[in-house]
């Protein structure tokens, strides 16, 4: 009975994790209460095309900020996310910092956050933890369905297990195995 309960709990948790993210919906963190007034960016990423942002700082931050870094992470249609990369934004004057990246051919979405570095080398992250923004591409795969307004990246061979599901399955099996060993 304990084994059955443990397996049921693991399956419920795995389903909740898999269902918690819905493909194609962009995410945006509020900049209220930060040194950032606004962030302008495209609301869709495209493979091989420029993806840029403009960050406008408060007047106080303009006088004290020496560097603005854009920490990006690109996730691809196979379910893999590349390690985060630091991109230094250029100060174009009047408190506006801008930069550009070019996502690869199989981009699913772009995650990012902003790091503000002051003259004392203190770093303020927006948001404090994780990535605050996620912008989906015009041709994406979220592990169960294709989406976007461009179908050129879609793989006709859907016989394999999607990348997002494999780690969840392995975690569920491992947790169930550990729980049954304790009994």
Question: Which residues fall in each region the model found?
Answer:
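Glycan-association/targeting regions that enable binding to alpha-glucans and other polysaccharides
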Residues: 2-6, 14-158, 183
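Juxtamembrane/start-of-transmembrane alpha-helix segments at the extracytoplasmic/lumenal side
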Residues: 154-168
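Generic low-complexity, intrinsically disordered sequence content enriched
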Residues: 8, 17, 172-174
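Sec-dependent signal peptide recognition
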Residues: 2-10, 166-169
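C-terminal membrane-anchoring or membrane-association module
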Residues: 170-183
